[in-house]
Amino acid sequence: MASPVMTYGIPGALKSFIDRCQPFYMAKYYRQQPLIKPDHAKIRRMLFICIGGMDKDDIFTGPVLTAKAFSDIIDAKYADELLQNDMDRIGNIEKKPEVLAAAYEKGFALGKRIVDEREK
């Protein structure tokens, strides 16, 4: 999942999508009928990529908590994250090739892990 930070949270469209998953939360925790079968849930993973404009370390607290809650609801283990603040000053992520490289590496590693676990 990828998202910018908007006022210490995730943008409305993505948040609305996540909020629409409330029935899956209820099915999983109250009715004990999760949407994802346990054998499939064990291989599901989430990588959270998030950028923020402000040069503050705490701007990711809300988005990370939301992403972790969402990953739990959809039975996708929160496997990793890539967070980049100070984008108002940086301007273009292409000015941070190390961040682009990290995004590629983390995405590749996540995909490899899923494939490896599926083949077990």
Predicted regions and their residues:
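Helix-loop-strand module that forms the ligand-binding subsite of alpha/beta enzymes
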Residues: 1-68
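Glycine-rich phosphate/pyrophosphate-binding loop and the adjoining helix
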Residues: 57-120
